[in-house]
């Protein structure tokens, strides 16, 4: 089970699942020549919790922590000063001063925060979806150092991260990465892997927005309209902090005009294509997503529906054509009579 190939696959799978949520001023990837790093947080040197809700099937001794992963990546040329800072649920702030001092002495601060493994999973509902315990207060303290702050998140569900987003310069959603946690996180933070993953669920601004499906009905949640509280929340926008399908990269991509014929072919398919160009400075993968919207129908339809996606590798400066084939049934829906219909 723990063969070299299995460990390499676990490392790649973990890194490939990580979603870059924020990257102000292109802070990431970090330079491998960074001299001093402050590493803080209850998940920065933790083995058991990073395996997630199936940790009973794993062995703590097999886990590479984030602290170990960064040291593996950078070697002795970089000083990594680790302070836990706080626990998940303990209200103590006794290590805040040490964490702040470490941050002040660093070139960059990496905070690894999130949930305990068994806070997620079956029968693990939470009413409040913010970071548990004193973790947000820890981030507020680290911000006072005035150094670039990278937040690595480990959690098993969407969280309400508006306050974290305001404090962080960069945010990486790592989920629960498993045994190769530290190596995978380091691969992404230091640019050996360019993030490409997208969110499979929306991250709300607040719990009061839930349910917040991306494919909500047009009449179910109207758009934000000024001076009217009848079509929106009165205290927050209707939008999510990070929507379904969202995810950044270290490189940039531009999309050409979508090519789509006006009719299906005789086999019931509609070919759709778009040219995607890597306009940034890194080779990278892009997940091209195809959505459809039925603007006029006999029933109220979702604002959009995902009908296809493809991950394509595009070297910097190059363009690739991405093609989809829509089936006529992809545009249908179940009506009030429980009949599956495709309307003109």
List each model region and its residues.
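Eukaryote-biased detector of low-complexity, proline/serine/threonine-rich segments
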Residues: 338-344
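Short acidic, glycine/proline-rich loop/turn micro-motifs
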Residues: 48-54, 120-125, 165, 302-304
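Hydrophobic helix-and-loop "lid/oligomerization" segment in the mid-to-C-terminal part
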Residues: 2-3, 81-148, 152-166
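Intrinsically disordered, low-complexity Pro/Gly/Ser/Thr-rich segments with frequent PxxP/GP/PP motifs
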Residues: 298-334, 338
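Secreted, periplasmic, or luminal enzymes acting at the cell surface/secretory milieu
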Residues: 1-52, 58-67, 71-76, 154-285, ...
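Short acidic, flexible loop segments centered on an aromatic residue
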Residues: 281-298, 304-306
